[in-house]
C-alpha cells in the first residue's frame, strides 16, 4: 500500500466525487479571520466538522455499553462552537461526504492544533467502498472545558491505495454504517 499525494486526491475528488464538497487548496483564513486550516495537503485531506454535535453526559448514571448504547447519554447541540466538558467527549460529523474507491483505505489522524490542547480525534478507518459522512469523536483529556470549532479543520485523512482490489469491500458486506448522514451512534 502506498500513501497517495495531493495530485491523486484532487483527481479522485474532481473526477470521481471522492470528497464533496472538495477544497483543492488549504483554507487558513475566512473573512480576514484565522481558522484551523482545512482542504488538500501534501499527502492528505484536512476535514471540517459540521455544526451538529452530540455531547456526552452521565446525568443518568448509566454504564456505557457498545452493544446496548443509551442515546440519552448525549445532549444534542447545534452551533459554531461546541464546548466539551472536562474529561468527556463529543461526537460530530464531517462537512465532507466521502466515497472511498474499492482499492483504497483511509486512516484519520488528529490535527496538531487540537492535539496540543489535549483534544484527541478518534475515527476508525474508512474501508474500501464505504460512503457517507464521517462520524468524528473528540475526547477532551483535560480537566478544563474545551472548544471545537464547526466548519474549520479538525482532522486529516490519509489515503492508502493497495496494489490490488480487495475481495470483499464494505459495500459488499453491507456494512452497518454505509451511507450514514448525520452523527451516527453505535450500532450492534
Curated annotation (Swiss-Prot):
One Pfam family here: DCD
Binding site for dCTP: 111-116, 135-137, 156, 170, 180
GO terms classed as biological process: dUMP biosynthetic process; dUTP biosynthetic process; nucleobase-containing small molecule interconversion
Domain of life: Bacteria
Reaction(s) catalysed (UniProt annotation): dCTP + H2O + H(+) = dUTP + NH4(+)
Record-stated family: Belongs to the dCTP deaminase family.
Protein name: dCTP deaminase
Native source organism of the sequence: Francisella tularensis subsp. holarctica (strain LVS)
Amino acid at each position: 500500500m502506498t500513501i497517495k499525494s495531493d495530485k491523486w486526491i484532487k483527481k479522485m475528488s474532481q473526477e470521481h466525487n471522492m470528497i464533496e464538497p472538495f477544497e483543492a487548496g488549504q483554507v487558513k483564513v475566512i473573512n480576514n479571520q484565522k481558522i484551523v486550516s482545512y482542504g488538500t495537503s501534501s499527502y492528505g485531506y484536512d476535514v471540517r466538522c459540521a455544526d451538529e454535535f452530540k455531547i456526552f453526559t452521565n446525568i443518568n448514571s448509566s454504564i456505557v455499553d457498545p452493544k446496548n448504547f443509551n442515546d440519552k447519554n448525549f445532549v444534542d447541540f447545534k452551533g459554531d462552537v461546541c464546548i466539551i466538558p472536562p474529561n468527556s467527549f463529543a461526537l460530530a460529523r464531517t462537512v465532507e461526504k466521502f466515497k472511498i474507491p474499492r482499492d483504497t483505505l483511509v486512516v484519520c489522524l488528529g490535527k496538531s492544533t487540537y492535539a496540543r490542547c489535549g483534544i484527541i480525534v478518534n475515527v476508525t478507518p474508512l474501508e474500501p467502498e464505504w460512503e457517507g459522512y464521517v462520524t468524528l469523536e473528540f475526547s477532551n483529556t483535560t480537566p478544563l472545558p474545551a472548544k471545537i470549532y464547526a466548519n474549520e479543520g479538525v482532522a486529516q485523512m490519509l489515503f492508502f491505495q493497495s496494489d490490488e482490489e480487495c475481495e470483499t469491500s464494505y459495500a459488499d458486506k453491507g456494512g452497518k454504517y454505509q451511507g450514514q448522514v448525520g452523527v451516527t451512534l453505535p450500532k450492534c
